[in-house]
Amino acid sequence: MPAHGESAGDELTAVKFIAAIERTLARLAPVHAVIGHSLGAAMSLYSVAHTGGANRVALISAPSSLKRELNRFAAAVGLSDRGTAAFIASVEAHVGRPATDFDIRGIAGKVDLPLLLVHDQNDRQVPVLESARNAHALPGAELMVTRGLGHNRLLADPAVVRAVVDFVAQETPTQEMMGSACTI
């Protein structure tokens, strides 16, 4: 991801995030499964919904709404209501699209593939309610809720890793298992 971790760049917007994921999916095609964490999970599902770039997706600690995440961030840094509105308007102007364009509820109709949602009940960064909303918006999605692992530790939890590996290892009924698994 640009401007993420050790990657080059000084800015990561939702549009750049999605473009990077879509380039990765195209380069690795065919992709059997995508595994995403946090905002990477939501942006991965958005990308797959618009490109058909994978046969199945595992979403770990995924927010259901970018706008709600922006509101949470604004509250965490102490912005007033007016400051929050200005912050969100600035982000939307910079990205060139309303934050609600990236909501999982809005893309649910474009997603017809196996989905695994994993979230910890004690996640303080992205509340578990977000995965409950995602499960409601994405009929047929399997929801696994853990306890006591928070936002990041669940990534290394043996039971979570096993559930994700088992999910990824399954063949999708309409397509042969081939290609790569892509972790975002």
Where are these regions (language model features)?
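Short alpha-helix in the alpha/beta-hydrolase fold that links the catalytic acid
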Residues: 113, 127-136
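Alpha/beta-hydrolase active-site loop
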Residues: 9-32
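Short beta-strand/loop motif that positions the catalytic acidic residue
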Residues: 110-112, 117-119, 123
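Catalytic histidine-centered segment of alpha/beta-hydrolase-like enzymes
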Residues: 149-161
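Catalytic histidine neighborhood in serine/cysteine hydrolases
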Residues: 136-152
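Gly/Ala-rich beta-loop-alpha elbow adjacent to hydrolase catalytic centers
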Residues: 35-44
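Hydrolase active-site cap/lid region
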Residues: 50-97
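Conserved alpha/beta-hydrolase
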Residues: 1-6
